[in-house]
Amino acid sequence: MPSNSASERSTTIPDRTPGELVVVTGMTGAGRSTAAKELEDLGYYVVDNLPPSLLRDVVRLVDETRGTAQPIAVVVDVRSGSFFQTLQANLAQGATGRHATLVFLEADDDVLVRRQEAARRPHPLQGGGRLIDGLVRERGVLADLRGDADLVIDTTGLNVHQLTDRIADAFGTPDTVRLKVTVISFGFKYGIPVDADFVADMRFLPNPHWIPELRPRTGRDAAVADYVMAQPAAAEFLDAYVPVLEGVASGYLREGKRFMTIAIGCTGGKHRSVAMTEEISRRLGEAGYETRSTHRDLGRE
């Protein structure tokens, strides 16, 4: 188990400069892939499962092809084995020519066991033994790296969103930390999405289902979308609702929230909600938010 004193290490990172190098390592199941994905979203060039002996070559290649200002993140795991000595030497000597930050992710053994079992994957060091045996070996192999880490994050009590927030707090800038908005369509007859922050009901709009030529189509088809958006009530709704969402989104960012889910429903989740989801996603994207639209119940009827 990680000690309390180490897991409470400050998460304050020294002032960052262009061309930073972040090295992510830590325990299997502690969230390395999640951290890497967030760093990629923050503009880092990410290399996963890199043998430390190739670190200088990767930095040189990125410098030559993308410029020295391109931040780089590399993920190194226990499968690199004895190469860890090379990594420590490179970081200690500044051999890459970049300011390097070493991030170590860990969690309590019982949490790591649950995560690995849920993923149905063996531990790379467990061999023919138990999963816990692999974790014990891994802690031993990584002990020195953990001691050298600039940032230790204990993910025992963190979910995916909370871990990405921690990474963004450490390595993001106002220009790179953006609110991620998901707009999801659904059918009320299948239930409201449980993770929705906002729910809007489109059943006040005329239903294309009752128009024979539109019935087999969906809200992603231009004919259906045009029909829905041509309704005066649809325009009134958008003009009133989207500014509210923009105001809330700005508040979310001020409060450190980085995810917002907006659910748009109609009877079956095929016509009205789908068209409105696409339009709201488009408008929020034009307002500068990172948006994606998804249609939970499309094709379910």
Swiss-Prot record:
Which residues bind ATP per the record? 26-33
Residues noted as binding GTP in the record, renumbered to the chain: 77-80
Please name the SUPFAM superfamilies in this protein's record. P-loop containing nucleoside triphosphate hydrolases
GO MF term list: ATP binding; GTP binding
Q: Name a Pfam family for this protein.
A: RapZ-like_N
* Record keywords: ATP-binding, GTP-binding, Nucleotide-binding
According to its UniProt record, which protein family does this protein belong to? Belongs to the RapZ-like family.
Question: What does this protein's UniProt record list under function?
Answer: Displays ATPase and GTPase activities.
Know the name of this protein? Nucleotide-binding protein Noca_2527
What organism, scientifically named, is this protein from?
Nocardioides sp. (strain ATCC BAA-499 / JS614)
